[in-house]
Amino acid sequence: LMDYLRMAERAGMDMSQDAVRWPKDLRAAHDRALAAELAVMADNNEYAASFREMSKRCAGLAWEKDGICIRVAERPSELVQEGNVLHHCVGGYSQSHAQGKIILFIRHSRRPDRSWYTLNIDTRTKKVIQLHGYGNEWANGKALKINKKVLAFVDDWRREVLDKWMLPQKPKKKEKAG
């Protein structure tokens, strides 16, 4: 219980609420507090500013077609959340994203907040590094196939958006007038 309470406090949870202080399911509350704490830490890690800058530079990669949309991850905590929901390891890719091997989220247009597929590309070579859905396409010991509509969407997106896109230059740091 003490471990959970420390994590909940560090994650910024409202400790005045009885439901936070005395959860009905301690294991589930512990897991939620851990995920929240990791998300807070991710948004404040040494790569967070570079991550957000790279995301802004790549905003032009957002696109929508036939009920599917794609957008760039905006904050490191989104990677942690994505990894938790889809049960894959994207949560540890903050540094890679900040360095140009970016993470994009593929969603149903009607549910853009709901995790579906995660795409990793190299902005310099414009190559797809990996595309994964739930559990890296493994469930109950069986390999699953990536949805054909998603594969077609990624092919169309590559042709219509990625191939024509150029990574904008880093914004120059403003010099202080002295």
Residues of each region from the PLM?
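Glycine-focused motif/segment detector
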Residues: 1-178
